[in-house]
Amino acid sequence: MAITAAQVKELRDRTGAGMMDCKKALTETNGDIELAIDNMRKSGAAKAAKKAGNIAAEGAILIKQGEGYAALLEVNCQTDFVAKDSNFLAFANEVLDVAAASKVTIEDLKAQFEETRVALVTKIGENINVRRIEYIDGANLAQYRHGERIGVVVAGEADEETLKHIAMHVAASKPEYVNPSDVPAEVVEKEKALQIEIAMNEGKPAEIAEKMVIGRMKKFTGEVSLTGQAFIMEPKKTVGDILKEKGASVTNFIRLEVGEGIERKEEDFAAEVAAQIAATNKA
């Protein structure tokens, strides 16, 4: 039977798929739209399963504040081009809205949005991954996003402007802890052993090496903690100095950056696409 433009339009509206894909699906089902949708969903799931092996290290960090807390979400794709795509961002924001409404776990988010994710993978042609969701509590919260790639929320006792500036500092300086005293003992001991070994390799006697390491460890714990770092807006002062001057404090912070911790392959996505086109041409 002949497939009409109205049928193709209806299938496109309901699935978001391309015109040629819709026409092909309708032709295969003799114009049965419901069967075409079922077949496209099955095909989409298969395509998504194949894409799942592709590394998704680009994407976006999104933030949404609720009553006394904030949610930070990372959703990944394969290229920065798709990271700016309206369909990708709409999906990410939909996930964030659900997460922020009731502090949903990452496992439940993945399960709830799996069908939508699969449909998006089919439409966009890249692997999409809802990677992580973090929550931070606090009566006073300030957030900062550096583009779509870095997101920070800071909780503390301070005015909004001060907390916003601290959030900007966290985005730039990547502290791991709030205070030097928060650095775990095992981290301190590991660094201390390393510094002693370095000092002794420099030819220093053991007792001298031990004394040298005291100063180095103070520097180390300061560099990895927020209040011990030089404040980016006033480098001659530490963040701790600034907070003390303002009678303020920071209780917690969360910093997320797109793709951190994901091992990337050397080959780029463009090369992968070229290889797929070449394989198609040979077929």
From Swiss-Prot:
Family: Belongs to the EF-Ts family.
This protein's record includes keyword Transferase: no
GO molecular function annotations of the record: translation elongation factor activity
Function: Associates with the EF-Tu.GDP complex and induces the exchange of GDP to GTP. It remains bound to the aminoacyl-tRNA.EF-Tu.GTP complex up to the GTP hydrolysis stage on the ribosome.
Name by which UniProt lists this protein: Elongation factor Ts
Keyword set, alphabetical order: Cytoplasm, Elongation factor, Protein biosynthesis
InterPro entries: EF-Ts_dimer_sf, Transl_elong_EFTs/EF1B, Transl_elong_EFTs/EF1B_dimer, Transl_elong_Ts_CS, UBA-like_sf
